[in-house]
Regions:
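Long, contiguous binding/interaction regions
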Residues: 1-80
Length: 80
């Protein structure tokens, strides 16, 4: 992957998105490589978060983060 960057982001889903296929949508909408490093989902409590490693051209990583944010996911970069 020439010109590729890697970025860790912590994503928190609001209760209304816990049942939605957010990662599926992200993978279909973006060419960034998405790797789930850690996750916690409690469907009954309506709580979900995941730590993603995104890889690809910097512009594509920004696009992936924007896609998540536009859908209501809180995205926090780790170690930028």
């Amino acid at each position: 992957m020439s010109g590729a960057s890697r970025r860790l982001v912590h994503c928190t889903l609001p209760p209304e998105l816990v049942h939605q296929p957010i990662l599926h949508g992200l993978v279909r909408a973006s060419t960034a490589v998405v790797n789930v490093r850690r996750a916690n989902v409690d469907v009954e409590a309506g709580v979900a978060w995941f730590l993603l490693e995104l890889a690809g051209p910097p512009a594509e990583l920004e696009r992936a983060e924007a896609w998540l944010t536009e859908r209501g996911v809180t995205v926090e970069p780790i170690g930028r």
